[in-house]
């Protein structure tokens, strides 16, 4: 199938064509000049498309058919936990008492919403083993930055101004060193050993009196549990540093293990991942941060408290790092996460982890004969393959990903983590059936065979999508980085 053009809505515009009508004016007409100063009024008409209602419906329906989401198909994007989002979450989030309130309302009028927020914090405290939680951060990387700022404030409050370095593993999420840099730290990399885990000897080498924190994901980005976590925590704590938990992979340990029991001092969660807030479209997310007792004074203000008179926000926080987001976090996502936690209960959350781990190991073992398996051991919720053997045949991991598009699958994460050559990172989540997993596995096996027998079909993929192989060289050398006004076309 050749590339199919899809006109922009602006390109469909025809002067005089109308797609809506306004009700008859039943109030006195007011001129803009009487309400706004001239510098706030447009000098020229806005360039809005003039299209019919039918054109609008067909245009956006066509675009929606090109989208892929967890409601339309399998989404095995490693390190992203693209699980199904139960629709009961959406129903509850649309309750008028949640959907129609305003953050500037008096606290007495939103006690129900505040109770939900408080209860959610308490649930997250129990799930993570922390002592307190803030719901303010808007997403994962925002939570990382917030947690690091808390650690920075803690060290500075103790007069320890020389702790300027944050240690991250070579398999870490790219947001970890980025967040550390934005928080004012220098990042130091600790190597992985031959088993895909943090090398303890290298950790001992890089930890010193300048260490502010070690950032870890556990299980790590290779899908492997850091079995030496207690010793790692001891190494960092003995040096005066803090241990930070990146909650990206919490789906692998729900009701099985808690970061607080592993020795972590700070944790951020991704409610839009682990706790089924919808994600993948750019937001909104929710990245609550939990801390141990000695970091509570530095939590962003206000904090939500419960007294005999109800719920209220406490702004009297002299050591707080300040606000990290207007108002009180992305409330709608928090409602969805709360609904999910209450729906599942402790036993349900335990089953989430058990099935996520089972699905990942099943897929890994079925695919291992056809792709390189860098670390041949049981994984947790996700696993990493390598396309090294296919690369020797002239087929790159990128080609494999594009070939999957021909079969209607969203490709896994590729080329990450960076310490695995030709990396293919797969996370099936717990919500997928064996039949779905088998269908994807069969296509991956077919692609591996094609790489041997007919590599061109993989190298030139995709063949059935509306947009086929793009000119990567031209895109890199001559990217279009600025908006270009379209030329109207005949529709």
UniProtKB/Swiss-Prot annotation:
Gene: gcvPB
Annotated EC: 1.4.4.2
Single GO term (MF): pyridoxal phosphate binding
InterPro entries: GcvPB, GDC-P_C, GDC-P_N, GDC_P, PyrdxlP-dep_Trfase, PyrdxlP-dep_Trfase_major, PyrdxlP-dep_Trfase_small
Cofactor: pyridoxal 5'-phosphate
Positions carrying N6-(pyridoxal phosphate)lysine: 273
The keyword Ribonucleoprotein belongs to this UniProt entry's keyword annotation: no
CDD domains, per the entry: GDC-P
Class in the EC hierarchy, top level: oxidoreductase
Function statement: The glycine cleavage system catalyzes the degradation of glycine. The P protein binds the alpha-amino group of glycine through its pyridoxal phosphate cofactor; CO(2) is released and the remaining methylamine moiety is then transferred to the lipoamide cofactor of the H protein.
Natural source organism: Bacillus cytotoxicus (strain DSM 22905 / CIP 110041 / 391-98 / NVH 391-98)
GO cellular component, one term: glycine cleavage complex
GO biological process, one term: glycine decarboxylation via glycine cleavage system
Catalytic reaction annotation: N(6)-[(R)-lipoyl]-L-lysyl-[glycine-cleavage complex H protein] + glycine + H(+) = N(6)-[(R)-S(8)-aminomethyldihydrolipoyl]-L-lysyl-[glycine-cleavage complex H protein] + CO2
Self-association and partners: The glycine cleavage system is composed of four proteins: P, T, L and H. In this organism, the P 'protein' is a heterodimer of two subunits.
Highest taxon, organism lineage: Bacteria
Family according to the record: Belongs to the GcvP family. C-terminal subunit subfamily.
Alphabetical UniProt keywords: Oxidoreductase, Pyridoxal phosphate
Protein name listed in UniProt: Probable glycine dehydrogenase (decarboxylating) subunit 2
């Amino acid at each position: 199938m050749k590339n199919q053009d899809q006109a922009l809505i602006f390109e469909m515009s025809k002067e005089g064509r109308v797609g809506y009508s306004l009700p008859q004016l039943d109030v006195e007409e007011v001129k803009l000049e009487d309400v706004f100063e001239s510098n706030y009024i447009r000098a020229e008409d806005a360039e809005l498309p003039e299209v019919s209602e039918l054109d609008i419906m067909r245009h956006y329906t066509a675009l929606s058919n090109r989208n892929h989401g967890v409601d339309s198909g399998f989404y095995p994007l490693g390190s992203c936990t693209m699980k199904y989002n139960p629709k009961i979450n959406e129903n509850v989030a649309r309750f008028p008492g949640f959907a129609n309130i305003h953050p500037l309302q008096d606290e007495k009028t939103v006690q129900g919403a505040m109770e939900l927020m408080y209860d959610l914090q308490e649930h997250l405290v129990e799930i993570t083993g922390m002592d307190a939680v803030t719901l303010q951060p808007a997403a994962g990387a925002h939570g990382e930055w917030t947690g690091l700022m808390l650690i920075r404030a803690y060290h500075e409050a103790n007069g320890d101004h020389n702790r300027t370095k944050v240690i991250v593993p070579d398999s870490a999420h790219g947001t970890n060193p980025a967040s550390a840099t934005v928080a004012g730290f220098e990042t130091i990399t600790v190597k992985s050993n031959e088993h895909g885990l943090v090398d303890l000897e290298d950790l001992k080498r890089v930890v010193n009196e300048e260490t502010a924190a070690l950032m870890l994901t556990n299980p790590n980005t290779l899908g492997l549990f850091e079995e030496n976590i207690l010793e790692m925590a001891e190494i960092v704590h003995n040096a005066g540093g803090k241990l930070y938990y990146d909650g990206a992979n919490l789906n692998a340990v729900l009701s099985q293990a808690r970061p607080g029991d592993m020795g972590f001092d700070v944790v951020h969660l991704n409610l839009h991942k682990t706790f089924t807030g919808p994600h993948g479209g750019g937001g909104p997310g929710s990245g609550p941060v939990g801390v141990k007792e000695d970091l509570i004074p530095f939590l962003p203000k206000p904090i939500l408290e419960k007294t005999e008179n109800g719920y209220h926000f406490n702004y009297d926080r002299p050591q707080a790092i300040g606000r990290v987001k207007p108002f009180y976090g992305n409330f709608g996502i928090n409602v969805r996460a709360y609904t999910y936690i209450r729906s599942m209960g402790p036993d349900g959350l335990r089953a989430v982890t058990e099935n996520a781990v089972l699905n990942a190991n099943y897929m890994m073992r079925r695919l291992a004969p056809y792709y390189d398996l860098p670390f041949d051991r049981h994984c947790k919720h996700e696993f990493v393959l390598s396309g090294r053997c296919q690369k020797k045949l002239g087929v790159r991991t990128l080609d494999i990903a594009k070939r999957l598009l021909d079969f209607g699958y969203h490709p896994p994460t590729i080329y990450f983590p960076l310490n695995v050559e030709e990396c293919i990172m797969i996370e099936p989540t717990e919500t997928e059936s064996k039949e779905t997993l088998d269908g994807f596995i069969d296509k991956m096996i077919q692609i591996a065979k094609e790489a041997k027998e007919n590599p061109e079909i993989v190298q030139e993929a995709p063949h059935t999508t509306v947009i086929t192989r793009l000119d990567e060289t031209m895109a890199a050398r001559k990217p279009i980085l600025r908006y270009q006004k379209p030329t109207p076309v005949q529709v």
